Amino acid sequence: AEDWSKINVVEGFSPDHITHTRFSGEIELGIFEKEMELPGGLKKKTGLHHVTLHNCSIGNNSLIENIPNYIANYRIGSDCFIQNVNLILTEGESCFGNNTEVSVLNETGGREVPIYNRLSAQLAYIIAMYRHRPDLIARLREMIEAYSLAQKSCYGKIGNGVHIVNTGTIRNVCIGDYCQIDGTSRLENGSINSNREAPVYIGPNVTAEDFIVSSGAHISDGVVMSRCFIGQACHLTHLFSAHDSLFFSNCQSENGEACAIFAGPYTVTMHKSSLLIAGMFSFLNAGSGSNQSNHMYKLGPIHQGVVERGSKTTSDSYILWPAKVGAFSLIMGRHVNHPDTSGMPFSYLIEHGNRSYLVPGANLKSVGTIRDAQKWPKRDKRTDPDKLDCINFNLLSPYTIQKMLQGIDTLQGLKQTSGETSECYSFQSTTIKNSSLNKGIDLYTLAVHKFMGNSIIKRLEGAPFSDLNDLHDRLKLTDSLGEGEWIDLSGLIVPKQAVKDEIDRIVGNPDSTLEETESFFQAMHRRYYDMEWTWVCSIMPRWYGKTVDRLSPRDIIRIVRQWNEAVVSLDRMLYDDARKEFSMISRIGFGVDGSTRQRDFDFEQVRGEFENDAFVKMVCKHIEDKTALGNELIGRLETLMTSMPQH
């Protein structure tokens, strides 16, 4: 040691397990008395071997060995294992990635989001997209800067139970508890918010700078990222590269590339040839070769696009930004005319003969759409009890139903304007065929009946009522919020007015905090179904011709029957769509060296029989269950009607 007086040790300390170690500056040491068991069963005594420490504190029972360079300015916790790491240091004061500006959506700037440890998809959405409120953006920037300054330190932190092995350089990185870093190349200026409930894994050949990684994330196999926020339980592997991008909960990115994207929850891109650039996505499934252009070779990469929640891109799909694609759409082919299909959710956007064709509502009868809705909640890998993002998985919500209602009006308006016998109709740089238009109206109508009926049945399910007053009590509003337009805040479906009120509160209150805004999003998420009911009641006059307090038992029976017809009709469409996967065409390639009979047998061994398919069984059971649910409520309402005085 340069100065032994600067070395402080805890009571019970013994130097028996410290060898070939140099100390410099202020040093604090814990005890080294336990053994550490490594993978494969090897046991090692904790201690310090072949390491140089400068201005460091070490907790109890950590093992640090074989550090070719040195460790400087770090607070290292207990039960850590650090081996074969070239260099770990904090240089100067650092905020460890907090307040890093990420030029999301527009590579040239203008929508920068300052990242911080607790950034949620909802707050990032507002910062990126609400530039029409500069007073709000300035206030949020102040709040994030204040938070970041509170994280500022000359000392980095390595939490308890951390393993770092065979790694290159770690510079100005704050590492949370139970993180595992194995074979990583370089980490600079970042925070890894690992914890016991949701440890983070950073694997071989990862290079990252100016970043924040949230709990439960897995990053490995040559990922290269710069100026990125990685949300909870995200999975980035297999040479994926990203810059100036935000990834929120449960995103999965492999092989491809992301530039300036806003990847809301469940954005998935798995293929080498896929490029996501300058777009906002959520619940996306990107096919191989999917890409977009944000550059027209004029004023630079200044264009952006929005693909609303739940959409899919097929192999080799392409969109020339700017464009906006409606929720739960399927994008196939190349689209260069800047379509805006946000008013037509659940549609197919297909290229044919260099034209973009829109098939409204077609995705409502797709098996894939329903399977996605079922698997998203099951694929929520977040184990951290403190969940940063609010995620609503509903396919049908005020957000999508309001668009369907507008879609019905738009499609009917096109018929009136261009004539019912027109072969094709023009809509927002796309073409809609006559047959597609009429089917779209029918499909949207079925979906609205299904959603409205669902909401009413949920209110009355399991709720006893003995007279008309009882019935209307069950249907009363339980939340004052909910009327008007709804929006999707990258996973959180919420009334637009509620967001406006919160923005006004933030701007009008100089003492507002990030914690209060977090609490607002959480409260909106909890109140969703109550606010949804308020919205449903607000559109009953349009859809049913009556306000909720004027509904009679007979009216509700009619609504339930419409709901049941809609549910069964849509389910039968799903059933027929699933059957296509068992057609003769689907059997091509089976039984390669055999007869037709052997081909069919080979197919059944691999794929099973149609009637025994898990999804097909689920659809059939869904029809039975919903029919029984509707009949039960109709029975109770008919009983109520018989007990009511006749006029």
Segments from the language model and where they lie:
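Glycine-rich hexapeptide-repeat left-handed beta-helix
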Residues: 9-32, 36-48, 65-147, 182-183, ...
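Long, charge-dense tracts
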Residues: 69-70, 74-76, 80-81, 86-96, ...
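Long, compositionally biased intrinsically disordered regions
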Residues: 352-647
